[in-house]
Amino acid sequence: MKILVVNNYGQFNHLIYRSIKDRVEARMISNETPVEDIVADGLILGGGPSMDRSGRCSEYLRTLDIPVLGICLGLQIMAVTFGGKVEPGKVGGYASVEIEVLEEDGILRGVPHRFMAWASHADQVTICPPEFRVIARSSICDIEAICHESRPLYGVQWHPEVAHTEYGEEVFDNFLEICRR
């Protein structure tokens, strides 16, 4: 199995790659990689500073028929690509936040109903796109995680790759299990 981590210039993308490469074959790629060059069993859209620097990520989401996990900016790209909305958050910067799991399925299978995660809410999804549903929230953000109704597309606002996030390894394990199907 091969997973590609799309580098959106975020400070934690190397941690995403390290978390995945210990489990399966993984490679970090530029977000300008042509879609026809992407051959993988799954794709992770990493975090980054802004939507303006998201390269071809929207094209990957619209074109590829493989599981995708969007992390932070990756979630926001997913939401906007499919008709959702992203706006500045009320609470900016990185902080620990309590995540409330609304749906224990997919990437959140086996994760407790509440856990602490490291997240930035400088920007956040404020309108969930059609054909997606909200699967986690917090007291500062109504849309902490989403999943598509029929495709294996998932997104989280928090950073499962950092040590400050509880159950981050489980989120990655669940995503890899989805990629194996």
Swiss-Prot record:
* Name assigned to this protein: GMP synthase [glutamine-hydrolyzing] subunit A
Does the keyword Transcription belong to this entry?
Answer: no
Q: Which keywords does this chain's UniProt record carry?
A: ATP-binding, Glutamine amidotransferase, GMP biosynthesis, Ligase, Nucleotide-binding, Purine biosynthesis
Assembly and partners are described as: Heterodimer composed of a glutamine amidotransferase subunit (A) and a GMP-binding subunit (B).
Against Gene3D superfamilies, the record matches this protein to:
3.40.50.880
Q: Which reaction does it catalyse?
A: XMP + L-glutamine + ATP + H2O = GMP + L-glutamate + AMP + diphosphate + 2 H(+)
The organism named in the record is Methanothrix thermoacetophila (strain DSM 6194 / JCM 14653 / NBRC 101360 / PT)
What is the purpose of this protein? Catalyzes the synthesis of GMP from XMP.
What is this enzyme's EC?
Answer: 6.3.5.2
Its pathway is: Purine metabolism; GMP biosynthesis; GMP from XMP (L-Gln route): step 1/1
